[in-house]
């Protein structure tokens, strides 16, 4: 799950914990799907962001909580997102003429009843 500076654009991550980091590919939309064991939820820690708002963003979506349950960010001091179930997605999207910026997201799983 460590994609730091790689050409990996998205993928399916089943690790208990790991990193999703900026990529250097030409692709403008990358989606990482994170899946934990049943009975677990996912904690995502988005480290401080400095993306170019209006040209690129990160979106975190809880796959089983409905279409309106997501976080979309382009800048800030950092965010923590907790899924309600064991599957979540992280999407990086940018305009085709805009260079990719760096970002780092740490994720890990915890049992459903536990607090982050």
From Swiss-Prot:
Pfam families: CUB. Keywords: Disulfide bond, Fertilization, Glycoprotein, Heparin-binding, Methylation, Secreted. It is found in: Secreted. Disulfide bonds join 9-30, 53-74. GO terms for biological process: single fertilization. Gene3D superfamilies: Spermadhesin, CUB domain. The modification Methylhistidine is found at residue 85. GO terms for molecular function: heparin binding. Residues 9-110 form the CUB domain. The residue at position 85 was identified as a methylhistidine by mass spectrometry. Its main location: secreted. One of its GO terms (cellular component) is extracellular region. SMART domains: CUB. Glycans are attached at residue 50. AQN proteins mediate the binding of boar spermatozoa to component(s) of the egg's zona pellucida by a carbohydrate-binding mechanism. AQN proteins are secretory components of the male accessory glands being coated to the sperm surface at the time of ejaculation. They possess as well heparin-, serine-protease-inhibitor-binding capability. Belongs to the spermadhesin family. This is Carbohydrate-binding protein AQN-3. It comes from Sus scrofa.
């Amino acid at each position: 799950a460590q994609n730091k500076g790689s050409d990996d654009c998205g993928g399916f991550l089943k690790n208990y914990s790991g990193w999703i980091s900026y990529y250097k590919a030409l692709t403008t939309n990358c989606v990482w799907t994170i899946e934990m064991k049943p009975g677990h939820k996912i904690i995502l820690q988005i480290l401080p962001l400095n993306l170019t708002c209006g040209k690129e963003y990160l979106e975190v979506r809880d796959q089983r909580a409905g279409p309106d349950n997501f976080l979309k960010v382009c800048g800030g001091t950092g965010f923590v997102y907790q899924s309600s179930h064991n599957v979540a997605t992280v999407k990086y999207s940018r305009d085709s003429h805009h260079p990719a910026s760096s970002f780092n997201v740490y994720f890990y799983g915890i049992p459903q009843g536990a607090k982050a």
